[in-house]
Amino acid sequence: MMTSNILSRFLPPNGSPSVYETIRNHDATSDSSDVEERAGLTLEDGPGEHYSDRELEDAMADAGRSRLLDRDDAFISRRSPRKASVAGPSKSNSRRRHFSRPRWAHDASPSHDFEDGDDDVPASLLVEGHHDDDELKSRLPPPPTSHITPDDRQPSRPGPSTRGVRGRGRAAKEQQPLHHADRRRAPAVRWSLGQPNLNTVDPKEKAMWMWANVENLDNFLKEVYTYFLGNGIWSILLNRVLSLLTFAFVVGFSTFLTNCIDYHKVRGSKSLNDILIKQCTTKMSLSSTFLLWLLTLFWIGKAFQCLLDIRRLKHMHDFYYYLLGVSDTDIQTISWQEIVSRLMTLRDANPATAGAVSARHRKFMGSQSKQRMDAHDIANRLMRKENYLIALINKDILDLTLPIPFLRNKQLFSRTLEWNINLCIMDYVFNEQGQVRTLFLKDTHRKALSEGLRRRFIFAGIMNIFVAPFIVVYFMMHYFFRYFNEYKKNPSQIGSRQYTPLAEWKFREFNELWHLFERRINMSYPFASRYVDQFPKDKTVQVAGFVAFVSGALASVLALASIVDPELFLGFEITHDRTVLFYLGVFGSVWAVARGLVPEETTVFDPEYALLEVINYTHYAPSHWKGRLHSDEVRREFTELYQMKIVIFLEEILSMIFTPFILWFNLPKCSDRLIDFFREFTVHVDGMGYLCSFAVFDFKKGTNVINQGDRRDPARQDLRADYFSTKDGKMLASYYGFLDNYGANHRGSHPATRRQFYPPPAFPTLGSPPAGEMGTIGDRLDQTQTRHGLAGPFMGQQSVFGPSRYGLTGLGDHASPAPSILLDPHHQPSTSGFRGTSRAAGVQRYRSSRAHPPISGTIADGDESPVATGRSDPSRPAANAAGASSAGGVGTSDSNLGDSWRMNLVEDGDDDNTEGGENVDAIAGGAGVLGLIQQFQRVNKDSRGRTAVGL
């Protein structure tokens, strides 16, 4: 008794099961056909049985044949109920009848009867009724012709039926069968994928059959996209084979260098045989032998997996070639937009509708994900997990700082840490079908899920300690073998830079596929390098110039002496055991590195313009950068995201040491926020499942869904709107970027908004304004956004719940998007969403620091500019937008917008006065402040008879 009491203090109570057991029980008891519950793609009639599209297609075909039945046979069958009752059990128990009857025609279990009650149409109005309805069973279509047994093929005939007659008939059929037995077993071949006869089927028909029987569309589209990125079956197989050979070479050559050479004999030996260790593998240490066997088993497993994937790659090749019409030679040059267009064409060519199926199966077919498969849906499926990670990085929910006293402000996000985050968080939140577990969408299990996530972080940190040494050794050897020769030939490449993994996740937008993001980022590299070189490093340049001069002079003298007498001088030792060739290599490398630090003499320094060009491609510009693009603080922050390759590699190596500490101390503190994040930023889309709320674009509302906040007083912002919004305009930039990639021209973006790529010039070109004429940063941003048609770099926060923190930029001048053939009708962008955007706010957003006088004091002269009058009343955005749309229409400019607010009295003419009065009456409803002001001005006009000023 005492022992049990002691153990009960340490062991968990029986009433609190593990969170993993709760998740497994919840997944096991959930109905897989319920999209709201599991968002799955299969429908089970019983344990282990799955409905396929082929069975539904046969059901539809059988329904068509049932209309051709003879009415006399139907009438006779109703006149002999006793005969049917006698023969029924024997046929139902036969094996042949089991194959001929579709599984969807079986009696439904009572546990599923409640699903039909969820339909919008009452059961009394449905043609099919319920599963257990006898009338429905009588109207079920007959089995296919090839499935009918010989007994079923013979129609019933009137006449007496006795046991003797039936016995003689059966004996005659056994002696002389009317139909061969093979014809009765033939249909079983079509229902099984593993039958040998499937190899003789037409490849196009087989590809169509596999497309019709896709159960998990997320996994299928990932295979389609991976095949597209791999450039075909042969390129994928070649890449995998070369990867296996590279792994084997690195492991084998490293083992040879560390265990098979006696380095003590190198100095006095003259051949390789003198320093080789005979039978070195038998003399290896126990740890080296264990590691070698472990890597060998891993290599064998990868090779076996590569062999198994050949069949799957062949199926994907047939899908591309026969259904999409894309060969392996064309897949390297075709665009992804064209692939999406052909997928939508294939979807539209194979409708999955039927009129002779039950309500439950119609509901299943209506929720098939293949009906929701345009560019927006495909991107959401492919990036279902990545969109959440983009939002996590954007909202700074993950604490990635190093838990070290002198490095607490340093963020570390490497590929190793990214892999651990996917393992601990994504695999915990998502189930096997790739959907968010509904358990995370309920706040009742918040504490248990948070504790489970903490334990996963701690366990992953412990596992990293055991795995890190092996990974460090492999990556160091691989990096050395790959880049040493490149650095030896071109030493200046040591200083080459690259975006860090954290920068890539900061720059990547929602629903932006990897190849589109990679293309956009690659185009920014020349401008990023130019920006980093823009800052004059006067002290560094002077020292580097001196070092380059000295090293170059010494290398020149040695090279000249070698040319004069090469045979004598090349073997000449300058120091002990150091010849001229050695010092030529040393001085040449020092000169190359120092010369690379010295900029060209003709370089024009303009860091603001260079960074603006970078922002045009990265779409990343925090709000605190505004007005400070020339500062050294912004440069240091940008260089943290754009570091040298050698530094990134060292961080990857060091991250294998520091990752366990981040997993132990930092990330467990974020577990509560992570659980809340997935619960609060997950929405359900019919036919697709659960998605990140930021990745579901509202095309109908356009940019009007993003409200503009008061930039003058950030303290007045709604905290709830701040919480439910993205930082730095991420959602709006993603929206515009998506429309740019999948615009009206599906082979590229719209020609009007597409910007051609040019390498960065050494100085501002004719198309680039000089430094003296570029004006303030606000004007330059306005010019950049107008020229490129992209979302402004300083977009602040936007939310679907409330006003944003900072004013949006780049919206007023953005053209209304044209309809796209890559989007379904419910995803077509609405021009009204762009028409309603207030352009007065676009004029105001860069001049918000100027105080706005009250309305009572806005008495302007007649020659005042329309823009100034357009900014006279920022307190009425609704009336401003309405006035702009009524007077200027869709394409009105800022000057027209200002005119729409003016009450022209004499000089503008009677027509303008009448139109302006009618528009204001329509807006203000004939009363209110605007109506009183208009009446007051008309009274002044009639009484004084002279020109009044505009409002």
Curated annotation (Swiss-Prot):
Principal subcellular localisation of the protein: membrane
Cytoplasmic side: 1-240, 311-456, 478-542, 600-645, 667-951
Protein family membership: Belongs to the ATG9 family.
Disordered: annotated span: 1-54, 72-186, 810-919
Name assigned to this protein: Autophagy-related protein 9
Keywords assigned: Autophagy, Cytoplasmic vesicle, Endoplasmic reticulum, Golgi apparatus, Lipid transport, Membrane, Phosphoprotein, Transmembrane, Transmembrane helix, Transport
Intracellular or extracellular location(s): Preautophagosomal structure membrane; Cytoplasmic vesicle membrane; Golgi apparatus membrane; Endoplasmic reticulum membrane
Domain characteristics, as noted in the entry: Forms a homotrimer with a solvated central pore, which is connected laterally to the cytosol through the cavity within each protomer. Acts as a lipid scramblase that uses its central pore to function: the central pore opens laterally to accommodate lipid headgroups, thereby enabling lipid flipping and redistribution of lipids added to the outer leaflet of atg9-containing vesicles, thereby enabling growth into autophagosomes.
GO cellular component entries: autophagosome; cytoplasmic vesicle membrane; endoplasmic reticulum membrane; Golgi membrane; mitochondrion; phagophore; phagophore assembly site; phagophore assembly site membrane
Organism domain of life: Eukaryota
GO MF annotations, alphabetized: phospholipid scramblase activity
Purpose: Phospholipid scramblase involved in autophagy and cytoplasm to vacuole transport (Cvt) vesicle formation. Cycles between the preautophagosomal structure/phagophore assembly site (PAS) and the cytoplasmic vesicle pool and supplies membrane for the growing autophagosome. Lipid scramblase activity plays a key role in preautophagosomal structure/phagophore assembly by distributing the phospholipids that arrive through atg2 from the cytoplasmic to the luminal leaflet of the bilayer, thereby driving autophagosomal membrane expansion. Required for mitophagy.
Post-translational modification: Phosphorylated by atg1. Atg1 phosphorylation is required for preautophagosome elongation.
Intramembrane segment ranges: 457-477, 646-666
Membrane topology according to the record: Multi-pass membrane protein
Quaternary structure annotation from Swiss-Prot or TrEMBL: Homotrimer; forms a homotrimer with a central pore that forms a path between the two membrane leaflets.
Record field: transmembrane: 241-261, 290-310, 543-563, 579-599
Organism: Aspergillus fumigatus (strain ATCC MYA-4609 / CBS 101355 / FGSC A1100 / Af293) (Neosartorya fumigata)
Biased composition (Basic and acidic residues): 23-39, 104-114, 128-138, 171-180
Ranges of compositional bias, category Basic residues: 93-103
Annotated GO biological process: mitophagy; piecemeal microautophagy of the nucleus; protein localization to phagophore assembly site; reticulophagy
Lumenal side: 262-289, 564-578
Swiss-Prot/TrEMBL catalytic activity: a 1,2-diacyl-sn-glycero-3-phosphocholine(in) = a 1,2-diacyl-sn-glycero-3-phosphocholine(out); a 1,2-diacyl-sn-glycero-3-phospho-L-serine(in) = a 1,2-diacyl-sn-glycero-3-phospho-L-serine(out); a 1,2-diacyl-sn-glycero-3-phosphoethanolamine(in) = a 1,2-diacyl-sn-glycero-3-phosphoethanolamine(out); a 1,2-diacyl-sn-glycero-3-phospho-(1D-myo-inositol-3-phosphate)(in) = a 1,2-diacyl-sn-glycero-3-phospho-(1D-myo-inositol-3-phosphate)(out)
